[in-house]
């Protein structure tokens, strides 16, 4: 017997325990000897006990792949999971395979008993009672011809009319013994009560249906029709859908490795066909991987259902091939069936085929989904809960509403509405979509019931929305719960319809609120509060740009204090400096407009697959860059600059950074703060290290010790460093203090670069599908000069040989008081994580939180609008009282589930 290790794929949903967490320990990673991230321990009594095992290989966490990553990256991904984690693992299983023998001569096949022994041999047991070994069984006589067309039964070598069916095990599936003609059987399961379950767990196995004569498989002679595919490029094929298999094969990039199990009886390719072999539309085919899957019109026409009653799947049956009938209009969500042509003495059998591409099953929906239709009235009569992390659920139904009449119940998951998938929508997006439907329009909902322990467990977890955003504008905090932020801050949004705001609430015209937690530099959640939603953020960002253009908002080019006015008037006398200073002052805001970046950008945590560029800021930047390239030329390379055609300043081409990264080196850049912003926008994500001087005398002593021949002014370098820390602190990855005359700061620089390269970074969500090796980011929507990085080194280092007066930074306005207290930026703030598991304490403040934002964005709120808000609040309250079957969030456990945040429609 030969042993074979196959990989079974399992997905477990873990709910974090407040004391034990998820209850697993992980180790390994591609930086370790094991290579894969492995579950090294499972804590007894934890959520992972009974679901995960020691030795499981973690493949995916909440949709993020953790294959070929470091263990630190996998741990960070698990840490970002707030309350729930969907963990997909690979679990090895050893199976016994019989020793291979020469295949029988063409036109012959194994006897029925031999085929049964073959199936049992794969299982690796001796329960069949046959004491013979595989070698003895292989020497048994073979007789009979196998008919590919016509007769579909197998007869024994003795010519009897009965034979044992094929008992085949392929990972998850065992095909039961069939009768002589392998007739399909029809079984109807009818629910008597809603609490009943069908009690069937289905599995699937991919097999080779057909081999084209012109393909590589036909020329290789290593594959045959009917072979069971166990692995595709090392990934177990058990329970994979055809669409998932297609995507897996398309990612093979020219080399496809298949682990197959030979089915000598070719049972799967000999299933009695109900239609002609030429009707390929009835079985979805993935052989043509160069084109999209399509569903061709069938050659025969499906008649009305055999029975008058409508099943939950609304299944239909096709008429016999010989008598085509006019085609009935079908719903795309139906699961159709085909029937065996009737013959004398035989009854009719339904063979449920592989669902079409348009069916719900192929899109990941289970067969117990329901389709309900009703016209939209003044109100929909539903209360929605959940979000993009768990799905959209019905947490309440208004008695007497059309939804109630169609049988929608509390706990139903809404999968689709009028062709719009709801599985990845936030609660705010789902509510806005439903409210956007005009009254009187027919609504077709695809729902799925969630009952039992899984429903209670989900409702108690209080999870819903979960995604991460990066901000691209500035906002002042609005106490007590309104969070402020600057450009580059990252937030974890957990509720897109914070109680008391948004669609369906009385304050909707004031703008909605998102409940979010600020992410710290350690990738942990810090303080939690509310921020404006997407539409409100767009208004505030536009207001910020308008105020900056008018010179009255934050970051405006014209100062309001006397000292700023003095520097402004002084810059007017320096005509050559004014244009450059003013242009660079507006560069950051203009960059956002040029790149078409929204106020909020969806981001995900991902490991960098290339050597990130390094920007060193501060009074010793030139010394650090020179030492790095001298000591480690194989790791670092200074990006060369070139002169502008219309300006004496210099630039660095983005292509230069890309070329250095392709050499597996860190590009050392001497660029301006706005160029750092641009690098982040085009997803190069530089490592920005700021060397902070302790004082001007200490800086002078350090420069004299490190570079005694330098003539650069310590006063000027210190002033530049103060200004950088004040205005560009949000760009710093790390800040290293300069103490004394030792080189400890240089050792810290090298350590920071090494640590940051290994850490995951926040990358744009919409770029996940691009190649990780493609660093050429041309065509990302930037302006014509987006490929250039300004490297006027007076802005961030001490390359200036003169000590003349001038603008301190190329990207800031006129000089300001550098002695002012430097306020720490949002990303630089260090505070202990504050967890607010039950954010009901924030309820009731939805109006007061937005007062300051409303004053900033709209000072013309009329009395008529306030009256409309009052009427809307009254209607909302009246609608809530009509809910007889919905549970309020304050209800007790005896009354029903605590659904957490929910929205009435």
From Swiss-Prot:
Q: Which gene encodes it?
A: Tjp3
Guanylate kinase-like domain ranges (all copies)? 573-754
User: PROSITE patterns, alphabetically?
Assistant: GUANYLATE_KINASE_2, PDZ, SH3
Composition-biased stretches, type Basic and acidic residues, lie in 851-877
Q: Which residues carry this modification: Phosphoserine?
A: 111, 128, 156-157, 161, 195, 311, 319, 343, 359, 584, 891-892
A GO cellular component annotation in the UniProt record: cell surface
Q: Which UniProt keywords apply?
A: Cell junction, Cell membrane, Membrane, Nucleus, Phosphoprotein, Repeat, SH3 domain, Tight junction
Q: How does it assemble?
A: Interacts with occludin OCLN, claudins and TPJ1. Interacts with PATJ. Interacts with UBN1. Interacts with FASLG. Interacts with CCND1.
Q: Which residues cross the membrane?
A: none
User: Which segments carry the region annotation Disordered?
Assistant: 92-167, 289-367, 773-818, 850-905
Q: What's the protein called, per UniProt? A: Tight junction protein ZO-3
UniProt-listed PANTHER family = TIGHT JUNCTION PROTEIN, TIGHT JUNCTION PROTEIN ZO-3
Location in or out of the cell: Cell membrane; Cell junction, Tight junction; Nucleus
Coarse class of the primary localization is membrane
Which residue stretches does the UniProt record annotate as biased composition, category Basic residues? Answer: 139-155
Q: Whose protein is this, by species?
A: Mus musculus
Extract the Pfam families matched here. Guanylate_kin (PF00625), PDZ (PF00595), SH3_2 (PF07653)
Q: Which residues form the SH3 domain?
A: 464-541
């Amino acid at each position: 017997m030969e042993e074979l290790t196959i990989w079974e794929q399992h997905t477990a949903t873990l709910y974090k325990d407040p004391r034990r967490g998820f209850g697993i320990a992980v180790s390994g990673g591609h930086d370790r000897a094991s290579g894969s991230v492995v579950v090294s321990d499972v804590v007894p009594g934890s959520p992972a006990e009974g679901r995960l095992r020691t030795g499981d290989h973690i493949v995916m966490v909440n949709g993020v792949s953790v294959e070929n990553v470091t263990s630190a990256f996998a741990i960070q991904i698990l840490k970002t999971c707030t309350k729930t984690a969907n963990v997909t693992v690979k679990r090895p299983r050893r199976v016994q395979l019989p020793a291979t023998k020469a295949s029988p001569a063409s036109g012959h096949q194994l006897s029925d008993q031999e085929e049964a022994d073959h199936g049992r041999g794969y299982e690796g047991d001796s329960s069949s009672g046959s004491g013979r070994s595989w070698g003895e069984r292989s020497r048994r006589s073979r007789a009979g011809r196998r008919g590919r067309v016509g007769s579909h039964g197998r007869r024994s070598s003795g010519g009897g009319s009965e034979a044992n069916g094929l008992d085949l095990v392929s990972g998850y599936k065992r095909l039961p013994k069939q009768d002589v003609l392998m007739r399909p059987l029809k079984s109807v399961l009818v629910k008597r009560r809603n609490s009943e379950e069908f009690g069937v767990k289905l599995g699937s196995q991919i097999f080779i249906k057909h081999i084209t004569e012109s393909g590589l498989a036909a020329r290789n002679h290593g594959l045959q029709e009917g072979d069971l595919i166990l692995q595709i490029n090392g990934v177990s094929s058990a329970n994979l859908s055809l669409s998932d298999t297609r995507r897996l094969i398309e990612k093979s990039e020219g080399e496809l490795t298949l682990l197959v199990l030979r089915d000598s009886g070719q049972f799967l390719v000999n299933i009695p066909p109900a239609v002609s072999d030429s009707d390929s539309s009835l079985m979805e085919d993935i052989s043509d991987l160069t084109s999209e899957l399509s569903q061709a019109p069938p050659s025969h026409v499906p008649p009305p259902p055999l029975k008058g009653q409508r099943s939950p799947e609304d299944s239909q049956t096709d008429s016999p091939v010989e008598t085509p009938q006019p085609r009935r209009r079908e719903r795309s969500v139906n699961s159709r069936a085909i029937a065996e042509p009737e013959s004398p003495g035989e009854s009719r059998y339904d063979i449920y085929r592989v669902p079409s591409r348009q069916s719900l099953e192929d899109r990941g929906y289970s067969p117990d989904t329901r389709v309900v239709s009703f016209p939209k009235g003044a109100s929909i009569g539903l209360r929605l809960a959940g979000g993009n992390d768990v799905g959209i659920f019905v947490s309440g139904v208004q008695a007497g509403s059309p939804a109630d009449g169609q049988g929608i119940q509390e706990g139903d998951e809404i999968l689709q509405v009028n062709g719009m998938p709801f599985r990845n929508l936030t609660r705010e997006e789902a509510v806005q979509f439903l409210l956007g439907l005009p009254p009187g329009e027919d609504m077709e909902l695809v729902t799925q019931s969630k009952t039992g322990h899984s429903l209670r467990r989900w409702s108690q977890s209080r999870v819903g929305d979960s995604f991460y955003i990066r901000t691209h504008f500035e906002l002042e905090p609005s106490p007590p719960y309104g969070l402020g932020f600057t450009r580059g801050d990252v937030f974890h949004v957990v509720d897109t319809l914070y109680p008391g705001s948004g669609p369906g609430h009385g304050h909707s015209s004031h703008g909605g609120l998102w409940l979010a937690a600020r992410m710290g530099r350690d990738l942990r959640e810090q303080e939690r509060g509310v921020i404006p939603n997407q539409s409100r953020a767009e208004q505030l960002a536009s207001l910020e740009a308008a105020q900056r253009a008018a010179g009255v908002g934050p970051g405006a080019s014209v100062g309001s204090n006397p000292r700023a006015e003095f520097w402004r008037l002084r810059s007017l006398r320096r005509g050559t400096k004014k244009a450059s200073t003013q242009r660079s002052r507006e560069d950051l805001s203009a960059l956002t407009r040029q790149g078409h970046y929204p106020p909020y950008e969806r981001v995900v945590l991902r490991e960098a697959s290339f050597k990130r560029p390094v920007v060193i800021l501060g009074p010793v930047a030139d010394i650090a860059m020179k030492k790095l390239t001298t000591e480690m030329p194989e790791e670092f390379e200074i990006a060369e600059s070139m002169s502008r055609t219309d300006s004496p300043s210099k630039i660095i081409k983005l292509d230069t950074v890309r070329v250095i990264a392709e050499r597996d080196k860190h590009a050392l850049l001497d660029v301006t703060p706005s160029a750092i912003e641009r690098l982040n926008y085009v997803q190069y994500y530089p490592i920005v290290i700021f060397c902070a001087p302790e004082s001007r005398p200490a800086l002078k002593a350090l420069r004299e010790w490190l570079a005694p021949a330098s003539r650069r002014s310590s006063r000027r370098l210190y002033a530049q460093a103060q200004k950088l820390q004040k205005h560009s602190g949000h760009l710093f990855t790390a800040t290293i203090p300069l103490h004394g005359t030792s080189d400890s700061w240089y050792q810290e620089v090298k350590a920071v670069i090494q640590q940051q390269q290994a850490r995951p970074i926040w990358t744009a969500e919409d770029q996940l599908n691009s190649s990780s090796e493609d660093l050429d980011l041309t065509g990302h929507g930037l302006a014509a000069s987006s490929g250039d990085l300004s490297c006027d080194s007076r802005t961030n280092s001490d390359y200036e040989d003169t000590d003349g007066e001038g603008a301190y930074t190329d990207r800031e306005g006129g000089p300001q008081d550098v002695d002012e207290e430097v306020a720490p930026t949002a990303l630089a703030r260090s505070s202990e994580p504050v967890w607010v598991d039950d954010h009901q304490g924030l309820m009731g403040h939805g109006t007061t939180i937005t007062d300051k934002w409303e004053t900033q964005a709209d000072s013309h709120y009329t009395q008529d609008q306030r009256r409309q808000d009052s009427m809307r609040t009254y209607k909302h309250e009246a609608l809530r009282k009509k809910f007889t079957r919905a549970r309020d969030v304050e209800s007790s456990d005896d009354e029903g589930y605590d659904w957490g945040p929910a929205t009435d429609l």
